Amino acid sequence: MLKTVAIQVQGRVQGVGFRPFVYTLAQEMGLNGWVNNSTQGATVVITADEKAIADFTERLTKTLPPPGLIEQLAVEQLPLESFTNFTIRPSSDGPKTASILPDLSTCSACLTELFDPSDRRYLYPFINCTHCGPRYTIIEALPYDRCRTTMARFRQCTDCEREYKQPGDRRFHAQPNACPRCGPQLAFWNRQGQVIAEANEALNFAVDNLKVGNIIAIKGLGGFHLCCDATDFEAVEKLRLRKHRPDKPLAVMYGNLGQIVEHYQPNNLEVELLQSAAAPIVLLNKKKQLILVENIAPGNPRVGVMLAYTPLHHLLLKKLKKPMVATSGNLAGEQICIDNIDALTRLQNIADGFLVHDRPIVCPVDDSVVQIVAGKPLFLRRARGYAPQPITLPKPTQKKLLAMGGHYKNTVAIAKQNQAYVSQHLGDLNSAPTYQNFEEAIAHLSQLYDFSPQEIVADLHPDYFSHQYAENQALPVTFVQHHYAHILAVMAEHGVMEESVLGIAWDGTGYGMDGTIWGGEFLKITQGTWQRIAHLQPFHLLGNQQAIKYPHRIALALLWPTFGDDFSADSLGNWLNFNNGFKNKINSRLNQDLNNKNLRQLWQRGQAPLTSSMGRLFDGIATLIGLINEVTFEGQAAIALEAQIMPNLTEEYYPLTLNNKEKKLAVDWRPLIKAITTEDRSKTNLIATKFHNSLVNLIITIAQQQGIEKVALGGGCFQNCYLLASTITALKKAGFSPLWPRELPPNDGAICMGQLLAKIQARQYIC
């Protein structure tokens, strides 16, 4: 018996060729009806008998090619209706919950056409199809149709329109479809904004500039990159000098996988990530014969590497025949530029020229950064290729919620029904441009999903801009402790929100429930409560933020409590004076400040903030053994310390003792400091390895004391590959179930998600 049904499909079904796929499937099966995009996903209506409908829905779910993904499918019977064929209908309006697809790297079919002299899109830098190209960064509103994207201003030529309307064509309903006759165009500008060249000549001009050591600002998918020849030491040094980025590693883009395999040691999973539709930056171990100059990632055994992911990048690198540095096109501490004129204004003193195009970018989206730990991808930055794909909540929210995230590595999130939409990485909220980007990201997500929050969730820290922004809105606000949010984000990913969990949240900073700076936390979370059961014994930040910039001050705050009030520069004698040029710089600072009466008085009188931060302990140890003099980017000292590890060198560790303090365990680091100062200070590999082993042993000790099977690991310290992998291995060996982030980063990029979860599933804090 015939019946008519409506199949409501939710998931990644817009911008992936879903409607053409459904059309072709219906044609193959001889079914009549229609399909369209809706603001919630897609709707398919067919009239057929029960078996045909069942076969159709099965094939729909099982044969949809990636990156399409059906997350929910509901079949509803309608009044019987007769159709004479199967059609694609115009999009319909309604509540906006459809998944927005991230931008996709260029597919192999488009690459073949790009370099085919007989193809009409030969060397066209904006070639795309239903399987690749811009999505999130061109979408202005839902549902996803050309008229609601920045491609609306480019009217398709006759040939493009024919492809767009031809059901069997790869560009059937490809919204960014274009060609050299009707689509976006390139131009090369000098520093004054004068057009020097256009179209292919602009590309040639950019390559010629890169070859002679110039820095070029290149407009890509989600914003501008600052690019230079990655094999030219002087060019890289010039970029660092102009961008005020003396030490932070730079990302490198390659034209093909063969070049990467020649100079790095990627495993199968890393290769899969590099070649995926998301095409993130992947951290790879160097080979000895690496052709890159050392100032790409000074002192670091790994480099952030990505493959060309747009046609423009492929064309550039094909002509350049070398890898190029591709770092975010911004000033230090600001968001990346997306507008041509804004880029000219802000990057004028960095770039020697500008390769621009006239396809507007709706919102800035940085490159994602991923590394492999314990055989799984671990995000360091979730942005292009992944955001803003929705994350299913463990249970629906009764109200529409807006989560503000933290202050560093900020992301924001909105929640409605059972879905959370986490923004792309927005950066540190330290400047007016990043505040503006933060506000625009909230406005953009709200517009896309027709979202008006009923309540706000924010970080507990009163000085955070995100906290203050929340307070200034005329809405109820719930403030959530930072490290609690870290652990909730991990728990939700693993579906253990109703279970008891030992949470270990280690990072650089977070406002504690007692008003001090936390960061080395052990949290016990049950179904109805959460409490701080252990923490690193607090130490002073001498000079507050100055201690973070100059971590020898942290070293002092560790040495004085360890060796006593009369400890001075002479106390460790030859140990501090190990003869090494760079270390002598650090030693001179240590020696000078060990005798600094003002700093000593700050410590003696307790006139400096206390912190239990594990991240700051890393800083102090790195300085103590002579690895770092001045911190110029977040995590620099910890990265330097991790780089010294030799994984198979030793299983030994330094002692850490646990003291009962006010019903909590305080982790006393003084025995560790004493033990380190008895080592040969030149053996930094040994000290770094034993230090990390000490932390793993600490986790196992407290886990065994608590006896909670599931142990969640969160916070920026768990970006450390050795620490995370060793902890996972040790926990499993000891009979525990380690939980660590998969969908979101361990750093503050996950805080907004944890905030949502704290509001949806309230727990009482036990002092």
From Swiss-Prot:
Protein's UniProt name: Carbamoyltransferase HypF
Catalysed reactions, as listed in the record: C-terminal L-cysteinyl-[HypE protein] + carbamoyl phosphate + ATP + H2O = C-terminal S-carboxamide-L-cysteinyl-[HypE protein] + AMP + phosphate + diphosphate + H(+)
GO molecular function term, any single one: double-stranded RNA binding
EC number assigned by the record: 6.2.-.-
Domain Acylphosphatase-like: 4-90
Annotated YrdC-like domain residues: 200-385
Keywords recorded for this protein, A-Z: Ligase, Metal-binding, Zinc, Zinc-finger
Family: Belongs to the carbamoyltransferase HypF family.
Pathway(s): Protein modification; [NiFe] hydrogenase maturation
